[in-house]
Regions:
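Active-site microenvironments in enzyme catalytic cores
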Residues: 6-37, 49, 55, 59-318, ...
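Active-site pocket scaffolds in enzymes
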Residues: 325-337, 344, 348-391, 395-397, ...
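Local beta-strand/beta-hairpin segments that build beta-sheet-rich folds
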Residues: 309-320, 364, 406-410
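Residue-level marker of beta-strand positions
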Residues: 46, 53-54, 197, 347, ...
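Exposed beta-sheet edge/beta-hairpin loop segments within beta-rich domains
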Residues: 186-191, 339-340, 383
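Conserved phosphate/anionic-ligand binding catalytic regions in large, soluble enzymes, centered on
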Residues: 120-127, 341, 346-350
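Short beta-strand edge segments in extracellular beta-sheet folds
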Residues: 414-416
Length: 421
């Protein structure tokens, strides 16, 4: 754990809303995003979230352009230096308060964008509880496939359909084969689901043909966002063999707009997942003593649901990245182990973050046992899977005694009716 004055829990900001209990964006956070003032003819540009305000980086002379890829490419040393300077500027003891007040934009007046241009997107399968739960529905006697505890499994996702929080999600159509049908049909998905995930935004990256050693892996991660990997389970069930997910996943993925840097998350590091007795140890390229000691991050992820009839969202689950079988450093090391090159702004998904308890399951597929036990919502409605008009809201939080509590904002999306019946 590498701490500095920016992590001091006693630190206060002259932006009063940043000092409020429960604030997602206290001065100890300082996440980066892309914004412009709503209704104004002006370019989108970089900003830093502080309380309920955005500090305009362009006004400070840091012109990122419409994405943060350039900042990510500079590496953690540069972003760490910038973070420390921003902390000094926004501190209650700052000598620049009067000047900086002019550079604040209220979040309510801002339009937020995807923070980076995403060239490539890989989605992993690090949540062992999710993998076991899903496998148990398909293979009750052998829920985990033999390779799971040896290799950080993943697949190549679709970058073009990644959208920022608040973007509506159209119910997809695809090939579905009902159990009693002789042939598949093309129809709107009736088993639309969410997946509670985190997304990790790549920093400088590596040259083609040059793997990133696990000991250096976190130097190539700019920060973390919330990620909802929408999934059409009925389409997925028919198409995924033998090559894995395709159209069941590629129609939409929702991200939160603020990138929380790894430096902000230092106080919430924890040990890697404790493997069961008899589990194999990681192969040498995935093994690092420091990573095993503190390569995990205790980032809590909550999923909330709001229906057209139920205006107050209800929490469906709360999981944590600390329950992932594989660490972030292992994900990066494995992704690049064959020489694959990561580029600034590339996205690595964690996979669904389910915990060991019923209230920590990160998908409706698990919560409802594939629709067999529908959820009963407070207003009396029932849900086996998502219905048109439902809004899913993902929230993230880091809390640890002796440190400030940080948030990630939201990754929200509302389901629109399918174009295909």
């Amino acid at each position: 754990m590498k701490l500095d004055p920016t992590h001091d829990p006693a630190l206060r900001s002259w932006v009063e809303s940043a000092n409020a209990p429960g604030c997602d964006f206290p001065i100890q956070n300082l996440p980066f995003g892309i914004f412009k003032r709503r209704g104004q003819r002006e370019p989108a540009r970089g900003g830093v979230a502080i309380g309920d305000q955005i500090l305009d980086l362009a006004a400070l002379g840091l012109r990122t352009g419409p994405t943060l890829n350039g900042l990510a490419a500079m590496g953690r040393r540069a972003s760490r230096k910038l973070r420390r300077e921003l902390s000094r500027m926004l501190s209650a003891k700052s000598r620049q308060i009067k000047r900086l007040q002019r550079f604040l934009v209220p979040m309510k007046q801002a339009e937020l964008y995807l923070p980076v241009s995403i060239g490539d997107y890989s989605d992993f399968f690090t949540g062992i509880h999710h993998a076991t739960n899903m496998g148990r529905m398909l293979r009750p006697d052998n829920p985990l496939l033999p390779n799971y505890k040896w290799v950080p499994i993943g697949y190549h996702g679709r970058g073009s359909s990644i959208v920022v929080s608040g973007t509506p999600v159209r119910r997809p159509a695809g090939q579905v084969k009902p159990p009693d049908a002789a042939a598949p049909l093309f129809t709107a998905s009736k088993r639309l689901d969410y997946e509670a995930e985190l997304g990790f935004v790549a920093g400088p990256g590596n040259r083609l043909g040059r793997p990133i050693p696990i000991r250096d892996a976190l130097e190539h991660v700019f920060g973390v966002v919330l990620l909802n990997d929408w999934s059409a389970r009925d389409v997925q069930g028919w198409e995924y063999q033998p090559l894995g997910p395709f159209l069941a996943k590629s129609f939409a993925t929702t991200l939160s707009p603020w990138i929380v840097t790894l430096d902000a998350l230092e106080p919430y590091r924890c040990a890697a997942f404790a493997r069961a007795a008899g589990d194999p140890g990681p192969l040498p390229y995935l093994q690092d003593e420091d990573d095993q000691r503190e390569g995990g991050f205790d980032i809590q992820v909550e999923m909330h649901l709001r229906s057209e009839k139920m205006k107050a969202p209800v929490r469906l689950s709360r999981g944590s990245f600390r329950d992932s079988y594989w660490t972030l450093a292992q994900m990066v090391a494995h992704q690049t182990s064959n020489g694959c090159n990561l580029q600034p702004g590339d996205l690595l998904g964690s996979g669904t973050l389910s915990g060991p308890t019923p209230d920590s399951l990160g998908s409706m597929m698990e919560l409802t046992l594939a629709g067999k036990q529908p959820l009963e919502l407070p207003g009396g409605e029932k849900r086996a899977f998502l219905e048109d008009g439902d809004e899913v809201i993902e929230r993230g939080r880091c809390a640890r005694e002796g440190y400030a509590t940080l948030g990630f904002g939201e990754a929200a999306g509302r389901i629109m009716p399918a174009l295909q019946k």
